[in-house]
Amino acid sequence: MPLENQTIDPTAQRAFALNLDDSIYGNFAEIGAGQEVARWFFAVGGAAGTVAKSISAYDMTVSDAIYGKTKRYVSRDRVVQMLDHEYGLMHERLDGLRGDRTRFFVFADTAAAKSFSGGNDCHSWMGMRFQHAVRSKTSDILLHVRLLDTTNARQQDAVGRLGVNLIHAAFHHWKSPRTLIEALLDNIGRDRLEIDWIHVSGPAFKDVDNRLLCLHLVRISYTPALLFDTDGTPLLASESIRRSRVLIERGRFAPVTRLNLEMMARGRIAFESDTSRNTPSRTAPHTADQIATGERGESHDMHDIHEIMEITMNNLRDRGSAEDADFLARVDLLSAVGKMVLVSDIGAFHSLGEYLAERHVEQTGLVLGVPLLRELFNESHYKTLDGGILAAFGRLFSHSVRLYVHPTRDVLDGRIITADTLTVAPHLSHLLEHLRVNGLIRGLICDESTLRTYSSDDVRSRICSGDPAWRELVAPEVAAHIERNGYFGAACPQAPDTRPIMNQP
C-alpha cells in the first residue's frame, strides 16, 4: 500500500525517503526470514527509484550455485560472498548506464529465524556495500544481530526494520559512525534485537577505529558485552568462545599488574586440572611463572582455554567516564601480554555466567581475590533479586562455573586470608562451606612469604608521582608500552575508592 494511504510508520518513512532519492540505487539479496527488507521499499511505493533487483536464494543448492559453497549459511563469510557477487553484477550491468549520477549499493542478509521445531539460535548477519559519493570506491558495513522475539513473524519484522534503518543510516550518517549505530534500532528497541558486533571499512570510514565502534555498542546498551582478541580485534563471542573453556578475571587493568597475571596463571593451573577430567587437554604443563611471563612452550594451545580479562563499564568509568583513549590503552596493554578482553556492562556475577551460557561456553572459571569473594557474600547486593543471595548463587553455579580465589594479605595486621580461612556472616557460613566442599569455590595456592597485595591504582599513582618502582609491579612488556606511549602519565586525578565493585543484579 502506498505511503500516503497508510498510517505513517517511521520505518516506512525512511524507505519512502530512499525511494524518492534518485541518486541511490541498488540490489537486495536476502536468505532466511523472508525478503523483509526489500518488502518495505515495495510496500511504500516508488520502489523503482531504489530497487534494481531483489533476490532470495532460499534453497541451499540454489544459494551455492549463485554465491559458491560455504560451510555455514548464516555467517559473515556468506554475507561477504553475497555482497561480492551482487555488487559485481550490478556494476557490470548498470555502471555504464547511470554510474555518473548514482550512488550504488547492495544490501545482503542471511538469517536463522525461529524454526517450526524450535531450539535453534535465532540470529542474522547483515551487510551493506555502498558508494558514499558518486564514483567513489565502495565502503562496507557488516553487523551481527541476535533475534530476541519469540515468534518467527516478529523476528522477520525486526530484521526488516533493521535493514531499512541500516540502508538509511549508511547514506545519511556515514560521516558520523556513532550516529549511524545509534540509528539502527530506531522504532525497534533493545528488547527485540541485540547488535553484538559491527565492522566498517572503506573510504567512507577511513579514520574509524572498529574497536571504538564496538565499545559504543556496549556503551549504548545494544549488547551487554563485547569480546576482543589478543591483538585487540573485536570478536563475535558466540563464535569465538563457543563450546570452549573460559577463564575470566575481572578488574580495572589500568594498568594490568604482575599480580593480575599471577592470579590468572595460578587460576589456569587449577581450572585446567578441574576441567581436564571432562575435557581432554592438549596443553603441555606449565608453572604459574611461565604462564604469567609468556614462556608457554611450543606445544601450548591457547585455543584450549581462553584467558579473558573482563573490564566492566563501571571499571572503565572509574575516573568519571569511559574515555576512548583510556579504553584503548587498557586493551593495548592486555594485548601486550596475550590476553583477550571482555568489555561488559554486566554487574552481577550470576548475570555474567548466564551471558557465557547463552554463548554456549562449556565450562567457566572466575578468578578473583578474597576481597571480592567477601563482597559476593554481602546480601545488600541482592535486595532487588527475587530469592536474594540463594537465587544469585543458584543462577551462577548452574552454568558449570567455578570460582578460583587468590589469597590476600590483610592491610591492617599482615595476616594471610584465603578462601578457606575467610569468614562471612554466621548465617551464611554454611553456604560458603557447602560451595567449598563441593569444589565450586577453590582456593589458589601461592608462596605466602612473597605475597604482595597491590592494585592497578597503586601502580598508576606511582607512575603519576614519578616513582620508578612501578616498573617492578608490571610485566616488562607492559612497562615498555606504558613508557613508549606515555600511558597514565599525562593526567593524574585522585585515585578512586579501590574497594571491590559489585553492581546491583
Predicted regions located by residue number:
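Nucleotidyltransferase catalytic core that binds NTPs
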Residues: 2-505
